[in-house]
Amino acid sequence: MNKIDSTLAERSSTHGSFAENAFDSQRLKRVVKRSNSYESMTHVQREALDMIMHKISRITCGNPHEPDHWLDIAGYATLVYKDLSNEAI
């Protein structure tokens, strides 16, 4: 097994199937993009929500007990908070 195959196998145990993940992630992102407030969001808010939706799909498709998924979500939310509070990000 080469390095790429090894990494993909390792990730599938925590992230689940890439195809399922892509489907769920895109579906979640469509919900956000259709929201009433999407157009008024900053690029920081939009990107953070995209990443949070991506992480949520990893939780629902993969291992929901993987601490890094939850830490990543908290990190993206914190970046938005800091941006809105005019703290350096």
Protein language model regions, located:
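Intrinsically disordered, low-complexity regulatory regions
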Residues: 1-89
